[in-house]
């Protein structure tokens, strides 16, 4: 869906005539610009249309704004074409008939789990008593505007705005993912007639978990690739602005790029007495081979 935006520098304290269109859209929460290269000007994917004061297709990451500029962001809608070409597939279970069975349960009966991927995010609401998934949300990770891969986001997080910390890359990416989760959790609780989540479990690669918690992943961008935090413990959701959750646990990372997403999956194979190969094929891919409580792991860009 296309958006037409008019820029007024006189009433906008966040921007100057040195701000690029991409920076403007990021700081104002305007979606629809893809930046696989993280805004370096190398991928050519962040094209937008300037309608005023001239008419031209430009790269958002390389074009400075000016007062009164009008820009058109997003794709044109056409008959038979979906608004977003990225469609996240879930397990296909139809639970719409079951929502009424879970109305009026108290907070102790409600759990939530989330997998924060580099490209996509999936969140589940779970009935603690039955173990049944009662609601699901999935979609694109909004941090894609800072780059398609983890290295682009590490670079974006390191380039903080010294004059405006709230608009630095790290803070903005944290705000993006927390806002997404807050919206989904609120929708699912309302949908299922519940009020609060007693425990929220999060799995994700090490970089995604750092960004969620507002911790700089800068050390993961250079040797020896040691993270500041390995997680594997409880956090207070309110510390990051996450609402409607009593407690939050983030699955532990094993090393720099073998994160909580693969350790969460490996928990299912710990009691298996056969040689097991576990694969996580994502934007950040991981592999684990082993038996029982001993595994050899590796990670790479998938």
Placement of each model-derived feature along the sequence:
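Local cysteine-cluster metal-coordination motifs and their immediate loop/turn environment
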Residues: 26, 31-67
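Fe-S ferredoxin-like electron-transfer domains
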Residues: 53-113
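Conserved phosphate-binding catalytic cores of ATP/NTP-utilizing and phosphoryl-transfer enzymes
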Residues: 92-109, 247-276
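Short glycine-aspartate micro-motif
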Residues: 111-115, 199-201, 276-280, 297
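Glycine-rich phosphate-binding loop of actin/hexokinase-like ATP-binding domains
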Residues: 123, 131-149, 219-234, 272-302
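N-terminal phosphate-binding loop and adjacent alpha-helix
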Residues: 142-191
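Glycine-rich phosphate-binding loop and adjoining helix at the ATP-binding site
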Residues: 149, 197-198, 211-264
């Amino acid at each position: 869906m296309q958006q037409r935006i008019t820029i007024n520098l006189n009433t906008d304290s966040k921007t100057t005539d040195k701000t690029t269109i991409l920076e403007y859209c990021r700081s104002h929460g305007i979606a629809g610009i893809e930046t696989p290269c993280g805004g370096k000007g190398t991928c050519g994917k962040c094209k937008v249309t300037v309608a005023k004061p001239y008419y031209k297709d430009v790269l958002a990451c390389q074009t400075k704004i000016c007062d009164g500029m009008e820009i058109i962001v997003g794709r044109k809608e056409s008959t038979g074409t979906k608004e977003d070409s990225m469609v996240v597939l879930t397990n296909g279970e139809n639970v719409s008939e079951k929502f009424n069975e879970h109305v009026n349960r108290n907070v102790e009966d409600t759990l939530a789990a989330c997998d924060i991927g580099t490209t996509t995010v999936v969140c589940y609401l779970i009935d603690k008593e039955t173990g049944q998934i009662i609601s699901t949300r999935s979609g694109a990770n909004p941090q894609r505007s800072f780059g398609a891969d983890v290295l682009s986001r590490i670079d974006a997080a390191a380039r903080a705005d010294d004059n405006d910390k709230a608009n630095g890359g790290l803070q903005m990416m944290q705000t993006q993912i927390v806002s997404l989760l807050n919206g989904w959790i609120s929708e699912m609780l309302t949908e299922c007639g519940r009020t609060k989540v007693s425990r929220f479990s999060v799995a994700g690669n090490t970089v995604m978990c750092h960004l969620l918690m507002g911790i700089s992943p800068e050390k993961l961008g250079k040797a020896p690739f040691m993270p500041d935090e390995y997680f594997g413990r409880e956090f207070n959701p309110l510390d990051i602005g996450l609402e409607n959750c009593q407690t939050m646990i983030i699955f532990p990372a094993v090393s720099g790029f073998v994160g909580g997403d693969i350790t969460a999956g490996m928990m299912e194979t710990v009691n298996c007495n056969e040689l097991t190969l576990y694969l996580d094929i994502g934007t950040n891919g991981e592999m684990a081979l082993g038996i029982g409580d001993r595994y050899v792991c590796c990670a790479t860009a998938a």
